Design a protein with these regions (language model features):
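Short, low-complexity disordered leader/linker segments with a strong preference
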Residues: 1-83, 412
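Extracellular/periplasmic catalytic domains that process cell-envelope and extracellular macromolecules
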Residues: 79-81, 131-134, 151-152, 176-180, ...
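Paired acidic/hydrophobic, glycine-rich loop segments that form the ligand-binding mouth/hinge
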Residues: 88, 132-141, 273, 290-298, ...
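Extracytoplasmic ligand-binding site segments that recognize negatively charged/polar headgroups
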Residues: 89-100, 112-126, 134-285
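Mature extracytoplasmic/periplasmic domains
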Residues: 323-392
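Tryptophan-rich aromatic "cage" segments
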Residues: 384-412
């Protein structure tokens, strides 16, 4: 019994001594074992957002963000044959002859080429795209300011440049140019040995009041866009004024620069409006005329001079410029029902066989390998004496310019 009491006493003493020494450090809790299985398993990948029908069409046809630099033409032609048809909206009557050439080369692919005129190509394209009922495959028209201000921003057409194309970058952006239409300052060659003006400001002088013929810019957006080229190049117009008069132009309250001042004075000088290009030529260049006129006319009408039906010559060398170029474009309609046939048509129409109906004196192609007819300027030469229509500027200023022109037309 005494032994048991001694054991109890010893245990109590040990406990008391431990208490006097302070609390023993607490062991850190053990970390839970890592779940190596869950770490090894990858998190489920997020699903890519589904493509819209338009995006699927673009991806399938390698257009837009899916464009490639090269094309497999054998595969494209085979796919085009399966599509069986291509529908082209053009603004030239020569599309009929081009369609004949196409039929000889691609008899298995029916071509429907429509000469709609520039305004109708635009309205038909916009109407189809907005309704979602797409019929057309190829845009083959100018479009002017509407191209950059409406058609391209709304993705109604898509850029396509065949890898067979021989064009400089400036002729393939924002779309591939098919040809250039040159409007030139011209004079009656029976009544003048040379151009009677050397500076574009001279056409605003009293001598030429009511003596300048032009396609009506109030009813033709293309003509008004060409006049806006002179407004856009305000610095060059200012320098031309200084070269002619020896001092800087005095601006009016409604003319912020020399470009707008020229347009105002041009309108005030009462140019004679005509409904179309043929009427312009008849009004200033009919053989046997006795009244002297100047005009803005199409250089592509020069074959009529060579055949003796008209009498005019271009005013090459006028300061600061002799004319304005209107761009004609090729593009594939958004969600075209026959996209491969559309690609094949664009490749064809920029080839020698395809462009043949337009390969006449006065028409320029952006292909540097094209040999121009004898006596005609080359594309490099004509680009030095003409301006391109500034399409974005024209889009932003067409309404204002039309009102401005009308307000000043024929005013003293």
């Amino acid at each position: 019994m005494k032994t048991f009491a001694k054991v109890i006493t010893l245990v109590i003493l040990i406990s008391l001594l431990a208490g006097c020494g302070g609390a023993a450090p607490t062991a850190a809790p053990e970390q839970p074992a890592a779940n190596t299985e869950s770490q090894a398993a990858e998190a489920p990948a997020e699903e890519a957002p589904a493509l819209s029908p338009k995006e699927e069409w673009l991806k399938a046809n390698q257009l837009g963000p899916y464009t490639t630099d090269t094309q497999d033409w054998a595969a494209i032609e085979e796919a085009a044959k399966k599509e069986g048809k291509v529908v082209v909206y053009a603004n030239s009557s020569k599309i009929a002859k081009a369609a004949e050439n196409w039929a000889e080369k691609y008899p298995d692919i029916v071509i429907e080429g429509y000469d709609l005129g520039g305004d109708d190509v635009l309205s038909k394209t916009v109407g189809e795209q907005q309704s979602g009922t797409i019929v057309g495959d190829v845009w083959f028209s100018s479009g002017g300011a509407e191209i950059v201000g409406n058609v391209l921003p709304n993705e109604y057409v898509w850029r396509f440049v065949p890898d067979t194309a021989s064009v400089a970058p400036e002729f393939s952006d924002p779309l591939l140019m098919s040809r250039l239409g040159t409007t030139i300052l011209a004079y009656n060659s029976e009544l003048n040995e040379a151009c009677p003006v050397t500076n574009i400001w001279e056409v605003t002088q009293p001598e030429w009041k009511g003596k300048f013929v032009i396609e009506d810019p109030l009813n033709d957006a293309s003509t008004l866009s060409k006049l806006l080229a002179f407004v856009y190049h305000a610095d060059e117009m200012k320098q031309a004024y200084v070269d002619l008069y020896g001092s800087e132009p005095v601006l009016d309250a409604d003319t912020p620069d020399a470009g707008w001042l020229w347009l105002k004075r041009f309108a005030q000088n009462g140019p004679i409006p005509q409904p179309g290009g043929d009427e312009v030529d008849s009004a200033f260049a009919t053989p046997g005329m006795t009244e002297n006129y100047l005009a803005f006319t199409s250089y592509s009408n020069y074959p009529d001079v060579q055949e003796g039906n008209l009498a005019f010559e271009p005013c090459w060398g006028v300061e600061p410029i002799s004319g304005v170029q209107a761009q004609s474009y090729l593009a594939i309609m958004n969600q075209a029902p026959h996209p491969n046939a559309a690609k094949l048509f664009i490749k064809f129409i920029i080839s020698e066989d395809g462009r043949d109906p337009w390969a006449k004196f006065g028409t320029f192609f952006p292909d540097p390998t094209y040999v121009v007819p004898e006596g005609m300027l080359t594309i490099d030469e004509v680009m030095k004496v003409t301006w391109l229509i500034p399409e974005q500027f024209a889009y932003e200023n067409l309404v204002q310019a039309r009102d401005f022109y009308l307000l000043n037309l024929g005013k003293p």
